[in-house]
């Protein structure tokens, strides 16, 4: 059976989502057409509103509907003197859920990757430099992912901090809580040994 152009267009639209292949996209499209047209219309409206009204915070670059996000607008956050640098807005959400960090964030929207043509300007390091110069910071926490690119990005930002006499720290890596030693990969185990701390 040949699908109509509109159905094909709907299926292709779903394929822009991460992890959604042709079969999953087709299943989603057919589900909405068969069983949930009102839900589809609501999804369409909410999606349109989000694309129209959600932008980036002018200070930290996370998603917000205002000029400044709720965190950057909070006076106590600025007074903390700490900045946490992350790769994505999802990382901000994850850290906020711990309720451990009370400072400001800067969202890179990626990491350095010269092979892919992503250099310092593509991830906003000029904006980060301005933030480092304008804020009274005592510590910058580098919470980039523990990948080759994430480590390279952390190293680069660490040098930016060092040039300004700001302490740069890296999130600890190692054993997951509740994990069993035999299932931990060698790289993670190495990080766990290097980052071990005294109990006394």
From Swiss-Prot:
GO molecular function, one term: zinc ion binding
Keyword Methyltransferase in annotation: no
Pfam families, per the entry: RecR_C, RecR_HhH, RecR_ZnF, Toprim_4
Toprim domain segment(s): 81-176
Source organism superkingdom: Bacteria
PROSITE patterns, sorted: RECR, TOPRIM
Swiss-Prot/TrEMBL GO biological process terms: DNA recombination; DNA repair
Chain intervals annotated as zinc finger (C4-type): 57-72
InterPro entries the record matches: DNA_Rcmb_RecR, Rcmb_RecR, Rcmb_RecR_Znf, TOPRIM_dom, TOPRIM_RecR
Keywords: DNA damage, DNA recombination, DNA repair, Metal-binding, Zinc, Zinc-finger
Gene3D superfamilies: 3.40.1360.10, 6.10.250.240, RecR Domain 1
Similarity field: Belongs to the RecR family.
Function recorded in the entry: May play a role in DNA repair. It seems to be involved in an RecBC-independent recombinational process of DNA repair. It may act with RecF and RecO.
Protein name according to UniProt: Recombination protein RecR
Record organism: Pseudoalteromonas atlantica (strain T6c / ATCC BAA-1087)
